[in-house]
């Protein structure tokens, strides 16, 4: 399962949706990046493949960051994507 996390302006908690295939995650990432670069704000409607009833709509001009990360196996440790603990031995 691949997670796409959106960080929104003035919001400390990210919005997450999941994709089963890396190609689908990459396509969604590109769609979000394209919307962020658009000169006029648009509404992005996102769904989740893990929780099929989950839907979210966000304005593209409110997105400040996008993180794509693997969420199965050893990567599902509960830590924020892209960070690790230097104290582990």
Swiss-Prot record:
Matching InterPro entries: UPF0367 (IPR020885)
Highest taxon listed in the record's lineage: Bacteria
Family: Belongs to the UPF0367 family.
HAMAP family reported for this sequence: UPF0367 (MF_01360)
Protein name from the UniProt record: UPF0367 protein PCC8801_1959
Organism of this sequence: Rippkaea orientalis (strain PCC 8801 / RF-1) (Cyanothece sp. (strain PCC 8801))
